[in-house]
Amino acid sequence: MSSKTVVWSSLGRFMRTSHHRLLDEKLFPASHNRHVQSRLLSTPLSLIAVPSWMSKCRTSAVRLSRHPPQVSGQEPCAVTASSSVGTWHGSSPAGLRRCQHVRSLNGWTTPGDVPIRHGSRSIATIATGCGGVGAGGINSSVDVAEVSGVSTSGVAAAPTVALPPGPPVEKPPLICVVRRATRGGAAADSVGTGTPGKCDKPPDSSNTLVGTIARVLSSSGECGRHSNANQEGYSLGSRPARKILVKLEADTVAAPLADTKEKQIYVQQQPVVVAQSPLARSSSTVTWEEGDTLVYNIFTQRVVKSSSASIRALSVLGVGVRSSEKELSVVDPHALVEFRDKLREKEVSWPSAWRSSLFNQLQHVLLKDQPMEEMISRVHELLQLHYQRVKRSCVANVTKGEPDTKTEEANPAGDEVAINGEMTYHERLLGYPDLNEEQRRVVDFVLRGYNTYIGGGAGTGKSLLLRVIRQELVSRGLTVATTATTGIAARRLNGATLHHCFGVNVYGEFTRRAELKEFDVIIIDEVSMLSKELFESLEFQLRRANGVDLPFGGVQVILSGDFLQLGAICSVSLVHSSVFRRNFAMLKLQRVVRQEGSSIFAQQLQELRRGTVPHDLQDTVQFLSPPETAKWLEGEGKGAVKLLPTNKEVDEVNQAELDKLPSDLVVYPAQMQAPSLVGRWTATYILEAVVKDTKMIDTHKLTRALEQYVLDFLQKTPYASDYTLPVVGQRYIVLYKLFVDAFAFRVRIPQDMSEKDMRDLALHLRGLETWLPACGLGVFLREILDSPDGLHTDADDYTLTRYAELHPMASPLRLKKGAKVMLRTNLAPGLVNGSLGVVVGFKELSAKHLPRFVNTPGRIAAVENYAEYLRYEHGFTTAFAPEVDFGGGRVIVVPPVLFSVGGLSNTNHYHVGIVSLPLSLAYAFTVHKVQGLTLAGRVHLELSRMWPCDHLLYVAMSRVRNPEQLTVSSFHNSLVRCASECLLFDDSLPPVEQVRVLPHFFQASWQRTPSRRKAALQRKREQAKQSKQKKAAKLKEAMIKQAKEATP
C-alpha cells in the first residue's frame, strides 16, 4: 500500500436529514480520497465515523495530526470519531446529540464492542476549516483524547512543543494519541500494512516518525512492559478501552514531517503483563494512564486517583504528584511563589475549605518572611515530614494496630471490644490467686460453661471478679466479648458498651448481627440498666446468627449487676424476663469489700439498699440543712465533689466554680486523628471492575469466592481445624467498595500465624492476578497497597465521626490555675482513673517536662502532634500542658492521651483516635454517672432538688469507702425507695455455696464440643513447635559432629 493510501472504514450508520445510509468497510486509494470527502461534505452530514481498520485486534492505534485550529466562521471539513473508546465529535452540538440519541436507542456499538459515548464538554466541532488544507491538499482532522471514558475537559492541555528548525509555520502542539483496543485477535504489524508483527522490535525507523513513537513509548515503559506479556504468560482479559497521552518533546522528533498529511501508524501492544513491583508501599499489577494512579493525599489523608478534584485543586500551590513515589510534592515552584506573593499582597484569600493542620502549617510557612528558595524548601520538607510520620507505622505486607490497642491473646476479635483500658495499676496485677474464697468459687463455677448471673450489692467486688473471669476464659483459648451497659463500667472492664459492640441503634435493633457469631462467651456488666426487650432481642439474634437452636445460640452469657441499684429508664426491668429466669444459674456475692473498714456504715447501706432508713444513719453520716450547706461549702467543704440530679446542674456548677477562679482561662480542644486499621492485616488488594457499572457485579458471589480462596490456604496451615468458611468470612475477610469502579480487599492475619505462613499467605494472595480473570468474577487485580492509610470510605468516616462526637473526651476542656480536676485514664501506679487533683500551673508541652512513663516513642509522637495542633490550628504561641497536684507529693505535667473509638466491622475495622488531655472538671457529677465508681475525697450529696427515685439514694451514698467523706443536704425519708419486685428477686438469690444447676440448663458449645475450643489447638501448636526445636537441635548436633569428623 502506498504512503498516500488512507484507511477508511465504516463504523455503522451516519445520519442525514432525510434518511440513513450504510457505508461498507473498504479501503479507498488516495485518488478517490478527495472525491469521497467532497461528496460527504456537500451533504447535510451530521456525523462521519473514521475508525481504525485494525480495531478488532489487540493493537494500539497511533494517530498523528498537525493542523491549525478551526477559525471562527469556517466550514468544518472533516469530523472524526475514535472507534476504540467511542469519543464522538459531530459537526454541531445538535447533530451530535441526535446521533447519540439514535445510537443509544438502537444499542449500536463500535467494532471494538465499546458502547458509543461522547464527552459532556467535547460537543463543539474539533475539525479544521476548509482553509486548513495540507500540502497534499487533503483536509485532515484532529483527535481529542479522552482518558477512560472521561471527557478531555478533565485532562490538562498539553504544552506547546518546540519543533525542529524549519520554515516558520503556525502549528499547534504535536500530540501522540495512543488508543488501546479492547478485543484480542490478530495483531497488526508495526506500520499498519503487511502481516501482523510484534511490538518489541519495530522496523528500522530511526529516522522516521514511527521510530520516534517507538522510542517515546519505550522510554515511558509502556512498550517494554507490554512486549514481555507472553513471556510471563499472564493476561488480565478484556477491559474497558483506555488512551494514553504521550507528549513528543522537541528533542525526540527525529525529523520534521515531509508534508502535513495525516499519517496512520499502528503499533501492536501485547496483553498487560503483571509486574512484580519492588516498591515498598505499593505494587502495581498493571500500567495505568496519566491521572489514574492511586495517590495518598496527605492533606485529606485519603487515597485518591491522581486526577481527582482534591489533587487538581493543589495545583494552585504548585503541589502535584511525584510519580516516582506516588506522593505529593512541589512540582511547580513558580506557581507556589506566585500564590505566595498574591496571598501576602492580599490579592487572594486562603480557601475556607483548607482547614486541616497541614494546611495551617503550610499557610504559616507561606506568610513567613523568608527567601524564595528557603520557602520552597520548607514546603517540600513539610510535606516529606508528614509522609514520614505516616510511614513510621507501616510494615511491609503486614498492617499492625496501634501500639496502645489492647488485643486479647488467642482472640481474633478481641481488639474490637477491648479498646480503652481503665483498670488501676494494682487491679491489672490481680489474678485468680488474689481473689477471696467466695470469688474463687464463682470463677470455678463459671468455667463449667453455664449461663450465669452474678448478683451482689455495691462494693462486693463484681467488676474485679469479671476481669479475672475474662482472663481465665481467654487463657483457655476462647473469644470473649467484654461489655457493659454504661461507658464508665465498660472502661473499668477494659471493654466496650453493649450498644457499641453489637451496633444497637436507638430503636434497640442489632445492626451488626454478624458480630454475634464471633464469640464463645459474652460478658455484660451493670445489667440492672439492661431492658427486658433488648436482652430478649440479644438472645434471638444469637440463636439466629449461630444457627443453633439452643439458648443464646450455644454462646455462654455471663451477667453481673445489682437490681437494687439504678435501672433502665422507661423500660421493663430484666427481672421480668422469662428468658433470664429460665436459662441462668443465679448466685449472689455476700462479702462487702469496699467498706470493710466501717462495718456499721456497710450495714446501714444494706438497709438503704432494701428501701429502709437506718435509725442511726445521722450518727454516721453528716446531715446539713440548706443554710448550713452554704456555710459548709464555703468553709470546710470547699472543693468537695457534688452529686446532683441532672447534667444541666452539673455543667452549671462546674462552670460556676471555674468562673470563680481569678486566673486566665485556657481551652484545650480534642484532636481527631485520621482513621487507622485495628489489628494485623495483609496488604490491601485493589480489585477493579471490568465493566464500568459495578452494579452488574455479583458482590455476594465475589465475596464467597474470595472466602473460599483464602480458606484453601488456611486449611493447609498447622491450625486448619480452627477455620471454616463461615468463620473465615466473618472474622478474616474484608471486601468493600472503595471507588466507583474498584473494591478493596484484605485478610486479617491470625494471632498465632508464623512469619513463614505470613509470607506464604502474601504469595497466595498474589495469585489473585491470574485467578480472578480465570473465574470470570468481573474484577481484576489492579494494585497492591501495603499501607491501609486513607483506604476508608466516606461511610466509615461518617460513622467514626459520630462515635467520636459522643465520646466524653471529645469536648473541649476548659481549665484555670486552681481548677479541681479528675483523671480520666491510668498514667502510673497511684495515678489512675478517678484520681482527684488541682491544677497548679502550666508548662511547655515538650518531652523534657513530661514524666518518665511518657518517654516512649508512641507517646512522644502523640505529644509532638498535639503540640503542633495547638500551635497551628488554635493559635497557641507556645503549646502548654497543665501541671496537676494529685496530693502526696505527686505533681506532674499531664500529657495528652489517645482514646480510640470504632474498630468494628461496620467501619471495615477502622478506628479513629481522639487525642486530648485526660482530665475533666471535678466539682460535680450526676448520680447515674458515678454508678460503678469509688470516689476519693469529700463528697457532698445535694438532695434539695432531687425527686424520689428507686435505689438512687443508695447508689449515691455507697460511692465512698468511709462515711466521714460524705455529707448530705436536705435529706428526707421519702427519698429512700426500693422496687418491690427487685427486692423479692434479690432475696431469692442463693449464696455461691448453694448455686443450683437445673436439669434443663445447657452448657455452652465451647464446653460441650471440645473441638471448638482453642486450647487443644494451642497444645497442638506447642507440640509442633517443640518437635521442630528438637529436630533443629538434632540437625545442629549432626552438623557439629560431621564438622569435627571432617577436621584432620
UniProtKB/Swiss-Prot annotation:
Cofactor: Mg(2+)
Signal peptide residues on this chain, from the entry's feature table: none
Subcellular locations according to the entry: Mitochondrion
Induction (record text): Protein level is regulated by mitochondrial proteasome-like protease HslVU.
Gene3D superfamilies with a match to the protein in the record: P-loop containing nucleotide triphosphate hydrolases
UniProt entry tagged with the keyword Protein transport: no
UniProt effect for mutating K462A: Abolishes helicase and ATPase activities, toxic for trypanosome cell growth
EC number(s) on file: 5.6.2.3
InterPro entries: AAA+_ATPase (IPR003593), DNA_helicase_pif1-like_DEAD (IPR010285), P-loop_NTPase (IPR027417), Pif1-like_2B_dom (IPR049163), PIF1_helicase (IPR051055)
DNA-binding region of this protein: 951-971
Record PANTHER family: ATP-DEPENDENT DNA HELICASE (PTHR47642)
Protein name: ATP-dependent DNA helicase PIF2
Lineage, highest ranks first: Eukaryota, Discoba, Euglenozoa, Kinetoplastea, Metakinetoplastina
